[in-house]
Curated annotation (Swiss-Prot):
SUPFAM superfamilies, alphabetized: P-loop containing nucleoside triphosphate hydrolases
A GO molecular-function descriptor: GTPase activity
PANTHER family found in the cross-reference section: TRNA MODIFICATION GTPASE GTPBP3, TRNA MODIFICATION GTPASE GTPBP3, MITOCHONDRIAL
Listed GO CC annotations: cytosol
Organism: Helicobacter acinonychis (strain Sheeba)
Gene that specifies this protein: mnmE
Protein name: tRNA modification GTPase MnmE
Keyword Kinase: no
Keyword Nucleotide-binding: yes
Compartment list: Cytoplasm
Family statement drawn from the similarity comment of this UniProt entry: Belongs to the TRAFAC class TrmE-Era-EngA-EngB-Septin-like GTPase superfamily. TrmE GTPase family.
Length: 450
């Protein structure tokens, strides 16, 4: 980690500006040779000519950040040049020719971590912030990058250290009875701490589900209007629509966004009794999709009375016990479907929508609202967020240890053991891992210039 490294810090491609970043003991010397300028005041921007082997490459902006007051904690130099990919690579190559090494993925951030400029929670936040596509999460990630998760964990750790110290004092005077007020006070303190951890964990789990996307299966018997519904929601002809039964023989998946939530639409084969082997396989996949989805859109044909196939679908819906939106299609035709019978057989949470123009704006707006009603309401204001499986596992283990400690309040040695184990798990959220392999895995998610 003592090498001087260099990399392009901006995305590849043409643009107004590209940034070449250098970090290490030799960074300033390399900048001086590139610019043929000897004096750089830290944190001042200089317009400089950039040279390579005495050949002028560009007129650019150069900034020097003196250690330890830089992102990495080392001497850092930035060259903000014109955004030509060829020019940028030539400037980077000039840095390498002068003794810098090409940075590995995430190596700048790794230097920042090892030089105590950032902790693990801030590193995790910066990774997720770069990859984030959900506007509602940006605030939580920005607060984590600012260090608020670290502060939250440090406060919890300090509270637990106080409990541990009190317990150790009582162990030294083990011949005396444990004061009842101590037991009550510690029990309440642990309950409060466990509740705050669970709140963080629950919010993070819900946000993870939101990022993954809600799976929405569209089912119904053949020609009920499933594919028309999918096409209307996508605003394109994604699925083939035909009067011939069994046209859709496999599931079709597409992703849309509804009110800030990612939704995976799954159009399925029409459910009916069939002798066609391929169609039967499609129907089996349709029924399987009900097990794996979060919400169901079940399309019924209002112009036809309920048939055996409809009741088979209703039975399948009831077995899933999942929320359902019942779409009653073709209400412009003479209604023959026994609506009250349908309602009486449904044993799951559902809402209902009638339409015959599945591509109408009013219908789609109504349908979107009904779908969104099933989404969990996430209040992201003033919320912290766990951004990795490692963080989640560490906090879950800490909660388990605190619950164990609460169950052993009257056995101080066991109580202290579980409190100490909880503290060790909290350390994993913000403090260094013991293995370089885990560090390398985490930092490899970054680009070269980060």
């Amino acid at each position: 980690m003592n090498d001087t490294i260099a990399a392009v810090a901006t995305p590849l491609g043409k643009g107004a500006i590209s940034i070449v970043k250098i970090s290490g003991n030799n960074a300033l010397n390399i900048l001086k040779q590139l610019t043929k300028k000897q004096d750089f005041t830290p944190r001042y921007a200089y317009v400089c000519d950039i040279f390579s082997n005495n050949i002028l490459l560009d007129k650019a902006l150069a900034i020097y950040f003196k250690a330890p007051y830089s992102f990495t904690g080392e001497d850092v130099c930035e060259i903000q040049c014109h955004g030509s990919p060829l020019l940028t690579q030539n400037i980077l190559q000039a840095c390498l020719n002068l003794g810098a090494r090409l940075a590995q993925a995430g190596e700048f951030s790794k230097k920042a971590f090892l030089n105590h400029k950032m902790d693990l929670s801030e590193i995790e936040a910066s990774i997720r912030l770069i990859l984030c596509e959900d506007e509602s999460v940006l605030n939580a990630l920005a607060r984590q990058l600012k260090g608020e998760l670290k502060i939250f964990i440090e406060e919890a750790r300090n509270n637990l250290l106080k409990l541990l110290a009190s317990s150790e004092v009582l162990i030294d005077y083990s011949e005396e009875d444990i004061p009842s007020d101590f037991l009550n006070e510690v029990s309440l303190s642990l309950e409060k701490q466990i509740a705050s951890f669970k709140d963080l964990l629950d919010f993070s789990n819900m946000q993870k589900q939101k990022n993954k996307g809600h799976a929405l299966s569209i089912i119904g018997k053949p020609n009920a209007g499933k594919s028309s519904l999918l096409n209307a929601m996508l605003l394109e002809e994604r699925a083939l629509v035909s009067d011939i039964k069994g046209t859709t023989r496999d599931t079709i998946e597409e992703v849309i966004e509804l009110q800030g939530h990612k939704v995976r639409l799954i159009d399925t084969a029409g459910i009916r009794e069939s002798v066609d082997k391929i169609e039967r396989l499609g129907i089996e996949k349709s029924l399987k999709s009900l097990e794996n989805c979060d919400i169901i859109l079940s399309v019924f044909d209002l112009s036809k009375p309920l048939e055996k196939e409809d009741f088979n679908i209703i039975d399948a819906l009831n077995r899933t016990k999942k929320p359902c939106i019942v779409v009653l299609n073709k209400n412009d035709l003479s209604p023959k479907l026994e609506l009250e019978v349908l309602k009486s057989h449904l044993q799951i949470p559902y809402s209902m929508l009638e339409t015959n123009t599945l591509n109408s704006k009013a219908c789609l707006k109504d349908l979107s609202q009904k779908i969104s009603a099933f989404f969990p309401k996430l209040d992201t204001q003033n919320k912290l967020l766990l951004t990795s499986l490692a963080q989640k596992n560490a906090l879950e283990n800490a909660i388990t240890e605190l619950q164990n400690a609460k169950n052993h309040l009257e056995t101080l040695e066991l109580f202290s053991y579980h409190i100490l184990s909880a503290i060790e798990n909290l350390n994993l959220l913000t403090r260094p891992y013991e293995t370089s392999q885990m560090l390398d895995s985490m930092f490899s998610e970054f680009c070269l210039g980060k």
